[in-house]
Swiss-Prot record:
Keywords: Carbohydrate metabolism, Isomerase, Manganese, Metal-binding. It is an enzyme of class 5 (isomerase). The gene is ydaE. This is Probable D-lyxose ketol-isomerase. Signal peptide: none annotated.
């Protein structure tokens, strides 16, 4: 079954985030071209994205994974720095650094070769973490799904580099 913007908005409501009808229409549904959006994908709403800063609300459904990627330098800028703040549910963020011996979640088995960073950061509501520019990372929601506020420098998603060559 396909994902609807109304379903995404129900997660925002669980987190106490109110979007207008026009904003709900602007929710973006991403499957990264892999065709398995409930397993690998991301839903988001962009409040603002200027040449100085960006603010988004991300939704991940239960067990849904945003694939490994990094935000490289672009046009003389060092790459996007982003802070994630968990608003609802639980999100497991994996970044460069010392490998977590027993990660709490794993990416989809069929895609595992495209995941190379394993330093685990567990975010619950109120928890936040800042990802430095040009740092490989991926994340997955826990059993309830997750809502995450992203605050960052300018977002130029078309320049993101994914570890998976299919994306």
């Amino acid at each position: 079954m396909g994902i609807t913007k109304e379903e995404v908005n129900s997660y925002y409501q669980k987190a106490g985030i109110v979007l207008t009808d026009e904003e709900v229409d602007q929710i973006q549904l991403m499957d990264y071209g892999l065709g398995k959006e409930r397993k690998v994908g991301l839903q988001l709403f962009v409040y603002v994205n200027t040449d100085r800063y960006c603010s988004k609300e991300l939704v991940l459904f239960p067990g849904q994974t945003c694939p490994e990627h990094r935000h490289p330098p672009v046009d003389g800028q060092e790459g996007k720095q982003e802070t994630f703040r968990c608003r609802y549910g639980k999100v497991y963020l994996y970044v460069e650094g010392e490998k977590t011996p027993l990660p709490k979640v794993l990416p989809p088995q069929e895609d595992r070769e495209h995941y190379t960073v394993w330093h685990e950061i567990e975010l619950e509501p109120g928890g936040q973490y800042t990802i430095p520019p040009n740092t490989k990372h991926w994340f997955q929601a826990g059993e309830e799904g997750a809502v995450v506020t992203e605050m960052s420098s300018t977002s130029t998603d078309k320049h993101d580099i994914f570890t998976d060559p299919r994306i």
